[in-house]
Design a protein with these regions (language model features):
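Positively charged n-region of N-terminal signal peptides that target proteins for export
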Residues: 1-5
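Bacterial N-terminal signal peptides
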Residues: 7-17
Length: 180
């Protein structure tokens, strides 16, 4: 086998192994979402990422945000952005196409990034009645995000952290990246 062919096969194997897919229901460990979601209110506009569990994809990211556009009753376009290093740093972004998996309740969103090579499921575990914040997680209990419409006060943020702990998450591992 030629070196070119071996290199191509190795690159293909690396690419396939790097693909992240949505978990199977047998891997679900997160709590069930608590309230239905009004898709037009939650899946539209800009949300600030004020806390998260660490992930390699967010290393060095601050001033994170998710921008949602509700396209129709089951499709949401997603643009996740952050700044590298400081709130004035270079922007890093990734866009994806989301599918609401439970129309009507609207608490489960599957987003396909990088032309579908990376797929993540997000559950809206809890939210404010006025849609000023929400807590999102993946169903495997490994990822957790706290989003707000505006930068929260320290007291408001602590309420959201306590709520995340009540949902069963180890909040001692949360990161609080600087905001805008």
């Amino acid at each position: 086998m030629s070196i070119v062919r071996l290199s191509a096969l190795a690159a293909l194997a690396l690419l396939v192994s790097a693909c992240v897919t949505a978990p199977s229901p047998s891997e679900y460990r997160a709590p069930e979402p608590l309230k239905p979601v009004d898709a037009e209110r939650l899946y539209s506009g800009r949300w600030l990422e004020v806390a998260r569990l660490p992930m390699s994809i967010t290393d060095g990211c601050v001033a994170g945000a998710s921008n949602y556009t509700l396209v129709n009753e089951t499709r949401v376009d997603v643009l996740d952005t952050c700044q590298i290093g400081t709130p004035d740093g270079r922007e890093k972004s990734i866009g994806g196409r989301g599918e609401i998996l439970d129309p009507g309740t609207n608490t489960r969103l599957r987003v396909r990034y990088v032309a579908g090579f990376v797929t993540w499921d997000y559950w809206i575990l809890d939210r404010a009645d006025d849609y000023s914040w929400f807590i999102s997680a993946d169903p495997t209990f490994e990822k957790l995000f706290i989003y707000t419409r505006e930068i929260p006060t320290d007291a408001e943020l602590q309420v959201l952290v306590r709520r995340s702990a009540e949902l069963g998450y180890d909040v001692s591992k949360l990161e609080f990246p600087p905001a805008e």
